Design a protein with these regions (language model features):
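Short, flexible, glycine-rich and Lys/Arg-enriched loop motifs at helix boundaries
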Residues: 1, 22-35
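Bacterial carbohydrate/catabolite-sensing allosteric modules
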Residues: 2-17, 30, 41-42, 58-66, ...
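Short beta->alpha connector loops
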Residues: 22-26, 45-51, 108, 166
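Active-site-adjacent beta->alpha loops and helix N-cap segments on the catalytic face
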Residues: 51-59
Length: 168
């Protein structure tokens, strides 16, 4: 996993990974206590987080690195996946299989993979049926609810694009 790779590379560079927190841990007061009362040089954030959390971390750490898909409008080092290129590769494959009516299940707002989905379908001259776009949180529950929404509408689609594994 990405977290394991970061841990290995840190070790190679003579750094020690002292703590690992999930998004659930960040809301816990004990986590804030650990952050504020222990000397730690830096933090690596994997995946989405809001600017207030980044600002908080920047206050307590000399180095903050964000790793994710959507770029942040912030002055932090960022390691980004080219989500447009990834989406293009996936949709090119789906299109090569003959699919022309492709539904979407996932987040829409500030989501580069959704923007790529729209643009790639338009560039291929395909009509986008707005009813076949299910704006749901990208999670297993979101994917489940999005699939139910599509099935209840009895739409004519032959493929579904989900931006991540959990949603799929």
């Amino acid at each position: 996993t990405l977290a394991h790779s970061i841990e290995q590379e840190s070790y190679k560079q003579n750094y020690v990974l002292k703590y690992s927190f999930t998004s659930i841990d960040i809301g816990d007061p004990r986590t804030y206590h650990l952050i504020t009362n222990n000397y730690v040089d830096g933090a690596v954030i994997l995946g989405r987080c809001d600017k207030s959390l980044l600002s908080y971390l920047k206050k307590y750490f000399n180095y903050v690195i964000y790793v994710g898909i959507n770029s942040l409008d912030a002055r932090y080092d960022q390691v980004l996946c080219d989500s447009f290129a990834v989406t293009e590769t996936i949709l090119d494959h789906i299109l090569s299989l003959g699919h022309r009516k492709i539904a979407y299940i996932g987040e829409v707002e500030n989501e580069e993979r959704f923007s790529a989905y729209r643009r790639i379908l338009e560039e291929n001259g395909l009509e986008i049926d707005e009813r076949a776009i299910c704006n749901v949180v990208m999670s297993t529950d979101g994917g489940y609810h999005g699939a139910w929404q599509l099935l209840k509408k009895t739409l004519d689609f032959t493929a579904v694009f989900c931006p991540n594994d959990l949603t799929a």
